[in-house]
Design a protein with these regions (language model features):
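Secretory targeting and sorting signals
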Residues: 1-27
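Active-site acidic/histidine clusters and adjacent loop/turn architecture
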Residues: 41-109
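Catalytic cores and adjacent binding grooves of peptidoglycan-active enzymes
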Residues: 121-180
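Acidic helix-start/capping segments at beta-turn-to-alpha-helix junctions
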Residues: 110-121
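Surface-exposed flexible segments
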Residues: 35-39, 48, 123-126
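Cleaved targeting-peptide boundary
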Residues: 28-36
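Conserved beta-strand termini and adjacent loop/short-helix elements that scaffold enzyme active sites
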Residues: 72, 111-113, 175
Length: 180
């Protein structure tokens, strides 16, 4: 069933991308991501064009859901590793964090987006699939209490998105919007 849901989600994203004429051009950053270079087993993947957002569009969506963001450099330049940028983030990634906010009721602060400086890979920050968030007791309890532990410090949601607790933040990979 999850495979069918994922396939339908991917197909819907492809149709949306075609309808609004978004670009599928994706760049890569240096390095590799051995944990998240491939989706979990059973995740349907189809070569499609993801719907990309500008930084302004993404922040408007985050703001409307009560989600905050911050950066160590106080900036949003995608080419500066001390900034937090949402330029070229996938629409489904923003919808995924909005779904997490709504479902958990937790305050969420995003600390990493599509800016340079993260590991590369198909499902990377640079390519718009990943966000980092601050740790909080509320968010920790929600993720660890509602999602399936898949080893180490990783949890998988029912929708197949991956939540990886990396020391001082959550590194979240959104393959889809998580039931938006």
């Amino acid at each position: 069933m999850r495979l069918v849901v994922r396939a339908l989600t991917v197909a819907a994203a492809a149709a949306t991308a075609l309808l609004i004429g978004t670009s599928g051009a994706q760049a890569t950053a240096n390095g590799s991501d051995p944990v998240f270079d491939n989706p979990p087993a059973g995740t349907a993947t189809i070569g499609i064009l993801a719907t990309k957002l500008t930084h302004a569009d993404a922040t408007a969506r985050l703001r409307s859901s009560g989600i905050t963001w911050s950066s160590s450099g106080g900036c949003s330049n995608r080419n500066n590793a001390t900034c937090t940028s949402f330029d070229q983030v996938n629409l489904t990634t923003i919808q995924g964090i909005q779904t997490l906010r709504s479902a958990s009721g937790c305050a969420i602060n995003v600390t990493g987006g599509t800016e340079t400086g993260h590991a590369s890979g198909t499902y990377s920050h640079w390519n718009g699939y990943k966000l980092d968030t601050s740790l909080s007791t509320c968010l920790n309890n929600y993720i660890q209490g509602n999602f399936s532990s898949i080893g180490g410090s990783k949890w998988e949601s029912g929708a197949g998105n991956i939540y990886y607790k990396e020391g001082n933040h959550w590194d979240i990979t959104y393959y889809n919007c998580g039931g938006c």
